[in-house]
Amino acid sequence: SMSLFPEAMSNDIRKRDDTDYRYQFVHIPKNSVYHYFENMDMNDETNMVYLNSYGYDWCNLQADEVKAVGRYEVTIKLPPVPRSGTYELRYRVLANGDRGVVQFYFGDNKNFMQPTGIPVDLTIGCRHQSTGWEDDTEDLDYNAEVDKRMRNNNRMKGAEAIANSGGSARKSSNSHIVRHILLRQHIDANKTYYLRLKSVLDSDRKELYMD
């Protein structure tokens, strides 16, 4: 997700190969203090931190992640699509009990955005009964049927990618990784779109997670 914010690279924050503590936990200021990322807005109740473990070779994509706690509301300017057409917007999360429940909004006017559906519980991984998940088998046709069932529930397994553990993010050992399909719709290549992530919980300790 940090690739959406050029300042993270130009200011030597992202992918910094340094194990010094101050470079591993970088706090992002609120907009009212200093608008650090041009492509991101956050409310005053958002406490955001960038966790950089590039020097430790974390299993996260590019060995980093972004987290926020508080009664957060974060709006992100999305990059353009290459051509107009029907696209899916997906949100990948490593689910655990520390995560929160998020309402997503999407639109081309960040002052008037529509919810993408019901709030998403980030504590729920692939094994939850609502997803339709089953572990991959040797039968590729059956695996495709399971994938289709999950897509009907707006879920996907982790990506078919190599992890530090030497396997795929689709493996049963990685079933806490889930991709949520937030929407499928026509996207105009000539428009700018935004995604808003807003906590719907009273708790200010549950996490927003972006990898």
Predicted regions and their residues:
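Extracytoplasmic
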Residues: S1-D211
